Design a protein with these regions (language model features):
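Phosphate/nucleotide-binding beta-alpha loop and adjacent structural elements of enzyme active sites
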Residues: 1-185
Length: 185
């Protein structure tokens, strides 16, 4: 096991195991708006981000301008500076491409992942539960913000997701406020 480092200096929720720099896999940043979480890896590792509202593609990165979720298709989303969300029937919003985890990995030819980071405003639950043992076997570390702190009725989803990660060989630890957890194999 390596040492814990912060990808954003001074932010405990950004802690990762520094073995990511020597692990053969890529960095996946779901919810990569402003690229601040993954910036430390740009130019050192292959970095692939996904975010429907990110417009910048820094040199050394790849971007899926949409949502990585549990299905291929379209979803309606409302943009908010501090956390966009899937629109309900009465909300205005934009139709955004959604791609399943398997389709995302196929599109970007992803076979080995050093870190999968997810800050996707509640969509982490269906995404994680759409993944199978083959998907989890590709991942060395998972960093996720479970959003039950915003919606306490999602606590059971967080518990089920933590159980799922444990079942797939991850030791999960709380790393900061706002529901941030790190899972390492």
């Amino acid at each position: 096991m390596g040492n814990l480092i912060q990808t954003i200096p001074g932010e405990n929720y950004s802690r990762v195991d520094d073995r990511a720099f020597t692990h053969n896999g890529c960095i996946i940043d779901l919810g990569c708006v402003r690229w601040n979480w993954s910036e430390i890896f740009i130019g050192k590792k292959r970095v692939i981000g996904a975010d429907p509202f990110e417009n910048e593609v820094p040199d050394g990165t790849e971007l899926f301008k949409g949502v990585v979720g549990s299905f291929d298709g379209l979803i309606k989303m409302t943009y908010q500076e501090d956390g966009s969300h899937i629109s309900n029937g009465s909300d205005s919003g934009d139709w955004i491409p959604s791609i399943s985890w398997k389709s995302f990995c196929s599109r970007f030819n992803i076979t080995d992942i050093s870190i999968l980071k997810m800050n996707i405003e509640g969509a982490e639950f269906p995404l994680l539960h759409s993944m199978d043992s083959e998907d989890f076997s590709k991942i060395d570390q998972i960093i996720v913000s479970f959003h039950d702190w915003m919606n306490p009725s999602w606590k059971h989803l967080t518990d089920a997701s933590m159980y799922l990660l444990n079942q797939h060989g991850f030791t999960v630890h709380n790393i900061g406020p706002y529901g941030w957890y790190m899972g390492r194999k």
